[in-house]
Design a protein with these regions (language model features):
Chain A
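Acidic-enriched catalytic cores of C-N bond-cleaving enzymes acting on peptides and small amides
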Residues: 1-49, 268, 281-307, 311-313, ...
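Short glycine/serine-rich loop/turn segments
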Residues: 126-276, 324-326, 376, 439-456, ...
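An N-terminal boundary/leader segment
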Residues: 1-115, 325, 345, 349-352, ...
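N-terminal, positively charged, Ser/Thr/Ala/Gly-biased leader segments
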Residues: 74, 91-154
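Acyltransferase
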Residues: 77-81, 111, 332-359, 383-393, ...
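Structural helix-boundary/capping segments
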Residues: 90, 167, 171, 221-324, ...
């Protein structure tokens, strides 16, 4: 047996001990008390750790409303920060959603902002995210913190530079206070790894919290954060947004700075690029984030941004929305069909929205190429990272078949690019010919599924392949009436049938969130967010 | 000896006859009369083909001023179109600058626009390029016209679709009337090919018209067009702009729609992408073009655009300009040094511009990689195209060594990408640390050189590699005082010395234009154009 400089188990044990030490004793909950519960959403307010003001701050506002309160001086930045640190600590103890905890640094910065504010009352006016605690997926670098991405070989190597976005968010006035869990390889639908373990879904702990930005999903669902940032190369913002019943925006590539995010791909891998975006409890918070970022000089922070500015576009008063009921390879499960129907019917009742049924072409071929784009040189680089500390692949890496992807050649790579250029033309034409403002469709063929069963990203990956922005809007939750139906309803062959069988009815899936995604034109993120806010206002009666 | 379906010579002969037939008899000049002259700039107004109004229309305005006259109804669109068709015909007979001639279609469209205008006087208000004749590099597809790019194998295959930009320009009100010459392979500094032959430089016919957009360069220098469109992957807009003493803008990749431009690269080749941009007799015409394009919905025309809108940015009143005197591998020739000094001194006299001397890092390594990016799979695809009709490579293809580029692997390609990402960070830092708005530097180490001697693009290619926008501003012309100096002044070794020796003094180089290029931040095309217009107003006393 090979000898490792250090075995992953001891690295993980030490890392977990250190992480635990970052939670003040007074904030510890009796986790055993909640061991039997599957739905943990109420625990933060019932566990007795938060005082009345902290419950108020963390429970009753979205980031937009909270920002207003901070500007009005209702609460100091320190009060707000402490409240969210506490609630994040509770969320973590319930779901294992955090990787790096730096509450002390955050509270110290909050105090400084409060001091500055006393000396110059105008200083906050200029900073659109002033005083707002923002959580980040572990892959973003924050000075002094590890960026292990759950790989043992990267533990205890604190960053000496911020990711471009972390630097920008600080300049915009935000408070960074924690980073969140993700899958080994950052490629699966289960936020599980050998260093930090698995993040649980607070709606139903028997189900996955989703991935790869699953830590954010669980943290935000429990309101341990109101605004977090994920990345999405095949669905990694949208899948956990669906699983955890929150809003999420996959921005177009480069619109939100992405440089300095740890990416496990071979350096220089191009083709389909990961994109960053916000996850939140309201869609207007996603807008707050996107507007703040797109109004700033992102190009000074990151040499790889796409400089699409926020334009304060007029909101359209009449919308045409393409409706895609299924993607032609994976049949949506009964709750997903019900959720999409519900959203469609609500939109149809509006005089301002016209629904246009659509079919998406070439999904199977596109998804095959997307999977190859994920690892054009094969997956040896992952094995090499695992082998440094002897860690095994997590189960969900096997579920998606990642380690069996073989590399292609330069010619094969360009052939994929050429096919993608053709697909891009076809899809633009589909949008233009139908004069649609957006497409509405499922985020996946199913809700959150039991652990380690999330097998593909055919509903989400298409939009990464084409680089169209996409927004997840929660619609409902699985309830008593969502019965399983017969597998004969699976229309697309044996693999589809296997996936379809996963849904066994409301007993196992109780409270699993149901969502839709809304997709807009490439780089038209602002227009899409406007459209999605309009749709959300009808579906969920918000803003 | 191999038998070809058809030999390139017969294809070229037939194509040239057809082209010649597109010029009305009344517009033919006695070309022999000008066989001895090297400077042809005055011939269009002295040859007797243009009447007084046509001379006025084509000689005394830039496109911006002419557009105003058209809107005022001083001249009909037909009058303007006929005048430019005539003058383009003259320019072509002098320099062989045109490939496809479609004057009839253009004049027919002009009549239609005039008719529409009579019926609805407001129709022109909405179209920013209303009634303006615009010429296109041959590689842009125009319905009904060949897109041979000077390759015999592509002759007699008329396009059934417009390039995205051609479609957009028509929708913006422009008149398309001709396409222009370029080098075989679209990769050299000499616009020469086996189908159409060589374009001459109207300033000095002993020198190259530059490439690859050399036909536009010659045509615009002779005012056979006021506004043309080129493409630039290593300098192909800027080199002919320098050689022909005109303005040219290499936009950032994707800002000006580029889809449907014939690209001889293997389909799907990515890495360094070609960018389109305007060439004109004034910089404000380049702005007119860029503003019109960037204000339109380019993303509806082209699935590959980068949606950076025109923002009507405030023009900065104080500028910091980085001055790069040479690029560290090729020593500028005496006229280039004089031109840059002249521009620098003029700018320094302004209270509003601060000059910051700069050195550019890593040019040699960057240029090596750029050259590999031009043909990552090697150059067999060119040979294959040549072989279809038995045509040989043109001399300038040998000069640049294109056919000896060997392919790389997918891993090698990603390694190049990774080096480029690092270079991009370094260069952004150079710009930001020095707080510069732009860099000013030579366009090449030399002016236009004798035929088939243009050997590299080390001054221009850098900005394609990094995707920074760049503007060419003419500064002066070679005159009596521009003596050659000793080769000891060549600082960078034998290859530099060979290049340096090319400049033999004002006898051979008489009237060769001298220019500078001004480079701005990636995708900040609008801000760069503002900066360049300001610099131009000081250097050339224009707007």
């Amino acid at each position: 047996m090979r000898e490792y400089a250090k075995d992953y188990r001891s690295i993980a044990a030490e890392k977990q001990r250190q992480r635990q030490s970052k939670i003040p004793k007074d904030w510890l909950i009796d986790a055993q008390k909640y061991g039997e519960a599957t739905n943990l959403l109420q625990v933060p307010v019932t566990c007795g750790i938060l005082d009345g003001v902290e419950r108020e701050i963390t429970s009753n506002y979205d980031a937009t409303a909270l920002s207003e309160k901070i500007r009005q001086g209702v609460w100091s930045v320190e009060q707000v920060t402490v409240a969210f640190c506490k609630r994040a600590a509770i969320a973590h103890q319930l779901t294992n959603c955090l990787t790096e905890i730096f509450f002390d640094e955050a509270i110290e910065r909050a105090r400084q902002l409060d001091l500055e504010q006393r000396e110059d009352p105008n200083c906050k006016a200029l900073r659109p995210l002033y005083g707002l605690p923002i959580s980040l997926k572990d892959s973003f670098q924050v000075v002094g913190q590890d960026t292990s991405t759950g790989l043992a070989c990267f533990v205890k190597k604190p960053a000496d530079q911020n990711s471009a976005l972390a630097a920008l968010l600080l300049d915009l006035g935000a408070i960074l206070y924690c980073k969140t869990n993700l899958p080994q390889t950052i490629m699966t639908g289960d936020s599980d790894n050998n260093v930090f373990g698995r993040t649980l879904n607070p709606h139903n702990t028997a189900l996955t919290a989703g991935g790869s930005t699953g830590g954010e999903g669980a943290l935000i669902a429990l309101r341990g954060s109101l605004l977090g940032v994920g990345t999405d190369i095949a669905g990694s913002i949208r899948i956990p947004s669906l699983c955890n019943g929150i809003y999420g925006v996959r921005g177009s590539v480069g619109v939100v700075p992405h440089s300095g995010v740890r990416d496990l791909a071979v350096p220089g891998t191009d083709g389909v690029r990961s994109a960053a975006g916000p996850m939140a409890t309201s869609l207007r918070d996603c807008r707050l984030f996107m507007k703040a970022v797109m109004e700033s000089e992102t190009w000074r922070y990151d040499s790889a941004v796409v400089s699409v500015p926020w334009r304060n576009l007029q909101v359209k008063e009449k919308l045409r929305v393409g409706l895609v009921e299924d993607n032609g390879i994976h049949t949506p499960s009964p709750p997903i069909r019900r959720g999409l129907n519900k959203a469609t019917q609500l939109l149809q009742r509006s005089n301002d929205i016209e629904i246009v049924p659509l079919k998406l072409p070439s999904i199977k071929e596109i998804y095959q190429d997307l999977f190859q784009y994920m690892a054009p040189l094969g997956t040896e680089h992952y094995s090499e990272l695992f082998n440094r500390t002897g860690e095994p692949a997590i189960p969900s890496v096997d579920t998606i078949g990642l380690m069996s992807v073989e590399g292609t050649t330069l010619r094969g790579f360009f052939e994929m690019n050429a096919r993608r250029e053709e697909a891009a033309k076809k899809y633009l034409q589909l949008f233009c010919d139908n004069r649609i403002d957006a497409i509405m469709m499922p985020v996946a063929a199913h809700t959150a599924v039991p652990w380690d069963r999330w097998a593909n990203a055919t509903y989400t990956g298409l939009w990464n392949y084409l680089d169209y922005p996409a927004v997840v809007i929660p619609v409902d939750k699985v309830g008593e009436t969502d019965l399983a139906d017969d597998v004969v309803h699976a229309k697309y062959g044996p693999e589809d049938a296997n996936l379809y069988r996963l849904y066994t009815g409301p007993e196992l899936y109780r409270d699993a969130p149901i969502a839709v995604q809304v997709i807009g034109y490439r780089q038209m993120d602002e227009a899409l967010i406007n459209t999605a806010i309009f749709a959300d206002s009808i579906i969920n009666g918000k803003e």
